[in-house]
């Protein structure tokens, strides 16, 4: 039997997909700008 692959961890999630990580790179800032333009209420994890 294989284990469940999703083992939730908020700290790991924030480190990989968080707002501060997005702000760090130019590409990340572009992602946030695109999500703002689309009207997302949640910009990042």
From Swiss-Prot:
For this protein, the parts annotated as crossing the membrane are none
Name under which the protein is recorded:
Large ribosomal subunit protein bL34
Q: Which GO terms describe its molecular function?
A: structural constituent of ribosome
Family membership noted in the UniProt record: Belongs to the bacterial ribosomal protein bL34 family.
Query: Is this entry keyworded Ribonucleoprotein?
Result: yes
Q: Which GO terms describe its biological process?
A: translation
This protein's GO CC annotations: ribonucleoprotein complex; ribosome
- Entries under InterPro entries matching the protein: Ribosomal_bL34 (IPR000271), Ribosomal_bL34_CS (IPR020939)
Pfam families in alphabetical order: Ribosomal_L34
Keyword annotations for this protein, in alphabetical order, are: Ribonucleoprotein, Ribosomal protein
Which superkingdom does the taxonomy of this entry point to? Bacteria
Source organism (scientific name): Clavibacter michiganensis subsp. michiganensis (strain NCPPB 382)
């Amino acid at each position: 039997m294989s284990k469940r692959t999703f083992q939730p961890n908020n700290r790991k999630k924030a480190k990989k997909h968080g707002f501060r990580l997005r702000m760090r790179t130019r590409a990340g800032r572009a992602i946030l700008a695109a999500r703002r333009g689309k009207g997302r209420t949640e910009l990042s994890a």
